């Protein structure tokens, strides 16, 4: 999973309000630009009043994106965007920077060039245009996302080196897109047979009653300045605001008294305020104390929540805290559990229509991803890196590891040499907890079309997180989908519980609430119980700050090793941990760091030059004279020195003729007219090639299976030689002499 990340309601649940609008308008930035700038950026000749108005509006946009109104970001200072801090040059830089941000936000669907900025800014600021544009571009503030060119439109960024990315979650995919736009050769190795990691949308239900349900990360937490909002905008995907109305019910199904509810909510928030006061007084002594122990001691000290109903209500709020942090309160640091609060994205929490898979699918477009590749070892050194998957060895200049913290804790990937001690200690200290779900699709919506969330209290404190909150996904899933959340200690017990018993319990809760109202609760059409803790590709849900840990550990985990080994993922960002947008932003961050490190190595003349420079189209033509496998218009070659079904090879597809629809699809893919006959290629495993041969039907059906079911992309011979030169070289050399026994299937 690359994030069931913290898709919660605000930690301090606000007073529940009346129903809001059903669909959230994500075009607020467009409206702001239209209102204040007339919808278009003007040329250089403007009145003084026009310039002042434009500058003020662009400053508003920059602030909404997290930039200070009259200062530089720390990253800008480190990048040396101005020669001297303070003064006129810095002020001018900020105005130019804000203009570039506003200019790109006015149309996030196209690449914004430096030349376009020069059209609207005076020539005297050309050096500031370059400084601001380069900083914003390379740090992922502009020209990111989907619908942008995968290859760099800038000539200076056409041969930056090669990177292997481990993990095809949000972090890995955002980094891949960005690195490819920078001119890097990139491949992604994914252990699962699907992309997305901890973001996983499952099609549930039956014919005529299907629903797209997010079993992992589901809520976009705070839409203001959220990069996932940009992706949704680029793809024209509507967002649905999670409405504030969240009625609570007692264990017997009766509604909670609103007066008691409001009072306990106030007590809960005051207890958290007291924790903040207490830790200031205690200083460093509070580092060894859990949030749970402090809250319980304060509750006893002030004598609050004494009655059964009050205690159950307080437990509901505590379960919500455990949900927000994917951890038991007894594990959370009283000092640093909320260290990321100052950085939280503003605005509403939203669901994405059709599920977050739509973002993942768009991010995968054009990115070479190899599925079913469970990484065993990552070797790194001065000359480059090697990623080992079974008997396969993939080589490149650098590697970006985006696996979840739970995988790093399990030490299932061997690093050679071993990771630095401070990084290993940070991995050990950090917390990685659980959130599980019971996802159900019903014949119809019985809980109310105007309700997004409702909650249920528990009789027992140790089970307070079991089905404590329900999300109605009917507004975005396409069906009557309802999700029950399981947090805290209950999420751990959930892992080993019988699914049929879990379903029986959750239906008992629902029927206890709705049957007394005269509402029949039908049996669900389909039910899925998640088990993120036992998932070997995640071993949990998302990170939190455990006792004796701090936000510094996120920074340590994000540190690269030797300028060759890099790390991304929600557990590497102290500002946005446990969120989908945090994972996405960490990928952009590491793309920038990889670019910087690669250029530094180039300047020091230490870059490892790619081998196999003698490979060309003639080599490829020669190899396919004697294919290992031929069926219809498909030919396959591979390394004859191994019988491993997972060993990689090359498939050639010959198009002697094709229908108008297929030809149009191919021409759209390659963005140019194509002449027949035509030969295209892809890289796949021997097992995939053999399975393709067994697909019944003609070549058209096999081609559809290749591109849609296997998710493979066809490329021309030049692109294949550029991308898979080492694989071609390995196959060629193994055919000449059979003395080698190591399979190198991925030097890029």
Cite the ranges covered by each PLM segment.
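Long, charge-rich, low-complexity intrinsically disordered regions
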Residues: 1-100, 126-140, 144, 148, ...
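FAD-dinucleotide binding site
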Residues: 45-70, 75, 112-118, 139-608, ...
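Short helix-coil junctions and helix-kink-helix linkers
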Residues: 85, 115-126
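Short helix-capping/hinge SLiMs at alpha-helix to coil transitions
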Residues: 105-109
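A short, well-structured beta->alpha microelement
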Residues: 198, 623-646
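Short, well-ordered coil/turn residues at beta-beta hairpins
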Residues: 402-403, 652-654
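Mid-chain, well-packed structural core segment of small domains
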Residues: 659-692
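Class I S-adenosyl-L-methionine
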Residues: 694-743
